[in-house]
Amino acid sequence: MPVSKPSELPKGGGGRWPICGVGFRSAQWGDLEVGYTTTGPLDCTPLYAGLPGGVCQCPHYGYVFKGRLRCVYPGTEWPEEVAEAGDVYFFPAGHVLVYDEDSEVLELNPAAALVKLMDHLERLASGATPEP
């Protein structure tokens, strides 16, 4: 059975997403992707360009060790949600994430959905044309 400290998860998903490996560590355990993100302030809106609706299609279940992140649901009447240090959260697909300050976040995500998202981010970061 896999066991790891968040900071010891493989960088960039063990080489699957090398460009994203700077602040993202993850491993696939069964049908979940266990991810650990460390980032400064970041509005992820531009990262979702090319995805359906310009929003993240992956649901996220997480815990905030440090910092604060907001989840915005563009084009809906859903209210903005905020998760701060010590909070657990669930953000369904169809969102945009905004990290308001330096943050450390652990997430458990459906592996198939996260792989699609991370592959998109890698293509975007490399300058390749994102796939729909």
For each feature predicted by the language model, list its residue ranges.
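Short acidic-glycine-tyrosine-enriched beta hairpin
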Residues: 75-94
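Short, conserved beta-strand element in jelly-roll/cupin
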Residues: 54-71
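Ligand-binding loop in jelly-roll beta-barrel domains
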Residues: 92-118
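A short, N-terminal "cap"/entry segment at the start of jelly-roll beta-barrel domains
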Residues: 1-53, 130-132
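A generic structural motif
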Residues: 70-74, 98
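A short, polar/proline- and glycine-enriched secondary-structure boundary/capping micro-motif
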Residues: 46-48, 81-84, 116-120
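Glycine- and charge-enriched low-complexity intrinsically disordered segments
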Residues: 121-132
